[in-house]
């Protein structure tokens, strides 16, 4: 009996000594990974873009009892009469809201000599200038559809127009230098969509469209562009834009103003954001 008890004691001691070694060979349970809180939205993002838009212009216009006359100006022809422009946009957005303003200022001009000897203005020089301003302001809410790298907003706003035409005549007759001017201003409400799609850290796509108007006016535009982020703050974009305008103002039988136009062509922009 003494030997049997001694043998069992040795077996038990050996088992206790071997248990840690066996346990060290078993796979150990990993410690739970630290849960990292998702990054919160960075708040408002602001963008300022300066751009140049090379446009073709077509449409028709008329004043008073005279019939409307069609017109078409290619980009080359517009550049021949180009006297200056300024174009830019400002946009502020976050995960819920968007707001912005777009400004287009342009001036065209040209002159000619009246060489028809039967004209009462024979020998005069006529100089025509056209100044146009188009300002669009909008705001909107994000539409929660699509992948997380798509920001799609429904927008409402207004687009204001200013047209100023001046005709200056220089006559060989002393003291005779008449000037004729026509100025028209109007504002149209608009509604549409604005989208910003992030392809990756470098590339992105922008799209914007809207349409609106009142009883005697209408306007609409579509814009698409591809952009490249050179740094976290600086990007460049290239794209295509089309803008439609229609306006009629009747202030009397001799003051019937009619204007309809399409402006369309490529553009390139430089954007700074923060």
PLM regions with names:
Residues 56-83, 103-134, 161-186, 213-214, ...:
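Extracellular/periplasm-exposed beta-strand and loop segments of Gram-negative cell-envelope proteins
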Residues 1-10:
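Bacterial N-terminal signal peptides that target proteins for export
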Residues 48, 88-94, 137-141, 156-158, ...:
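Residues on the lipid-exposed face of transmembrane beta-strands in outer-membrane beta-barrel proteins
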